[in-house]
Amino acid sequence: MVYVRDILRKKGSDARSVSPQATVFEALEVMAEHNIGAVLVLEEGKLAGVFSERDYARKVILQGRASKDTLVSELMERGVFCVGLSDDINTCMAIMTLQRIRHLPVLDEGGVVGVISIGDVVKETISDQKFTIRELKKYITGSHGPEIEAD
């Protein structure tokens, strides 16, 4: 089983954030600079919300608002679902699917230690499945030699 801590160990735990007083434009700059789809909104070091590309599309563009004049605090998602380091990938997948979200902040001892995206979950799931396929092929063929590549 793959756990959140395993994913963060591989990808790093650097979570990008902005303050609630940041403009939407500033949040978009951070997302573009780091090639990410969402930023955490931290107020005095505490998680206050999440602002995503989806929020921008639906709450700025479609409503004709100006990104340089709109504060993140006006549009961010406040009821944020989070996971912990000991949660497994299936828990992340279930939350993301049921809540129709793409990013999960990771908390440990009350503080933010990272973010898991739907891309991270898919990548890890594929990797885990490839490993399982290789092991099953070795078992079925009785092969103890070089690993057989999974397609």
Model-identified regions with their sequence ranges:
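Residue-level signal for alpha-helical context at structural boundaries
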Residues: A22-F25, G45, E74-L75, G110, ...
